[in-house]
Amino acid sequence: MYQLEIIPGKLSLKQLREVSRQPTQLSLTEDALPEMLISAEAVAQVIKDDKVVYGINTGFGLLANTRIAAEDLETLQRSIVLSHAAGIGTFMDDATVRMMIVLKVNSLSRGYSGIRPLVVNALMQLVNTEVYPCIPKKGSVGASGDLAPLAHMSTVLLGEGEARYQGEVITGAQALEIAGLEPITLAPKEGLALLNGTQASTAFALEGFFAAEDLYAAATVCGAMSVDAALGSRRPFDPRIHRVRGHRSQIDAAMGYRHMLGQNSEIGLSHQQCEKVQDPYSLRCQPQVMGACLQQIRNSAVTLEVEANAVSDNPLVFADDGDIISGGNFHAEPVAMAADNLALAIAEIGSLSERRMALLIDSGLSKLPPFLVDNGGVNSGFMIAQVTAAALASENKSLAHPASVDSLPTSANQEDHVSMATFAARRLTDMAENTRGILAVELLAAAQGLDFRSPNKSSELIEQAKMQLRERVSFYDKDRYFAPDIAKANQLLKEATYNALMPATLLPSL
């Protein structure tokens, strides 16, 4: 169980990675309480002064000019939650919901949303008791915030909707009972504060970001293994090459490969004097390609850490200034573009891996047995495993198409430009799964190739990586049922086993 004290607006990527990995016990710093109380009092004062302020005593969207009577204000907030809970599709994973609630608590507790502490505490209690609202994955365009997903989250606070507890779907009323909560009657603006925000898009994007980091680490390990398995040159990783180009991430990527390849590989030393001038690009240009991918990962890290700590509600309550202002912080364009760039990186990591794997099974290029198996003809070896990798790489090319360039007006053209951030971020999970599958196939192939170089050994780190695989999958001496081997290699990568082999500071959240 991860213990997380939220300092409003100060969540780190390392903390959020832990939230994504395991159940979390939340608490809030005492400093947050007065800020929320002052903000909530500012909203209450609007009602007392009989002012007209959007979201407090008006309708929403195109109905923003409709004044709501004082006796209907509680109904207004309840109605917006129930009417906006219009999502569709399979439910988000518990980890996604947990992340989404943590992000929402972080945003609301900064004191710009006019929401009472008891509502924020109730959200934390759901996480602390591992009661997760059932939230359909589909139904948000990422502006005016992630309305439908956040509405589904909020229904449980009212004793409505559904939740999941210990794998079972239960009613919202049962969820509150398990969490030790009573149904909440929302005060003015609180329903809107819960629904407005980019927390669903950002939760999906953070999951994709952490997966991209894991895949980058795995690809560096697999790529280094393939270099030695194919008797590739270490010269392309010379720091001088990358220093004169100047891209920091390329320089760091090359450093990662040198770290893995080491100085004392018997395989590397065995062909130092060979006459081969240049390796194919999939080996030689790894620092350039992976460096570009690393740059996209790092850029996304900056954007997503800011967004994770952002106030993306509307309107915003600036109690110290006596002002409540309507704006557009709910528009998730930064998240959409960060997710699109992550999609490019994830696709390219997989594409390069598939090409290395194809090189390994080609005996003319790798000088290894055809399809990495003895007695070819009788045995087909890795022939169709490479086809699987190719299929996954091709699928990712379609999924990598930018989502942020799409927009479809909603709410009778009041919300006439939207970000599509939720889809942009959500598809990263499928893309990461595809790339992980490609890398699993390469990992098996590279380990097979290294074993064919016996008795010569690779570097200490590469031998360690190979040993971790061989504890689960044995050498492929003849054809056997292949799918279980891919599944075991895939699971090894899913556990982020190779993150520990990366140099410190290479990846933002590690």
Swiss-Prot record:
Post-translational modification comment from the UniProt entry: Contains an active site 4-methylidene-imidazol-5-one (MIO), which is formed autocatalytically by cyclization and dehydration of residues Ala-Ser-Gly.
Keywords for this protein: Cytoplasm, Histidine metabolism, Lyase
InterPro entries with a match to the protein in the record: Aromatic_Lyase (IPR001106), Fumarase/histidase_N (IPR024083), HutH (IPR005921), L-Aspartase-like (IPR008948), Phe/His_NH3-lyase_AS (IPR022313)
GO BP annotations, alphabetical order: L-histidine catabolic process to glutamate and formamide; L-histidine catabolic process to glutamate and formate
The species this protein was found in: Photobacterium profundum (strain SS9)
EC number: 4.3.1.3
Catalytic reactions of this protein: L-histidine = trans-urocanate + NH4(+)
Family: Belongs to the PAL/histidase family.
Enzyme type, top EC level: lyase
NCBIfam families named among the record's database cross-references: hutH, PRK09367.1
Cross-link position per record: 5-imidazolinone (Ala-Gly): 143-145
GO cellular component: cytoplasm
Residues the record lists as 2,3-didehydroalanine (Ser) modifications: 144
Compartments where found: Cytoplasm
Main subcellular localisation: cytoplasm
Known pathway: Amino-acid degradation; L-histidine degradation into L-glutamate; N-formimidoyl-L-glutamate from L-histidine: step 1/3
Name used for this protein in its record: Histidine ammonia-lyase
Keyword Lyase: yes
Highest rank taxon of the organism: Bacteria
PANTHER family cross-referenced by the UniProt entry: HISTIDINE AMMONIA-LYASE
Gene Ontology MF term list: histidine ammonia-lyase activity
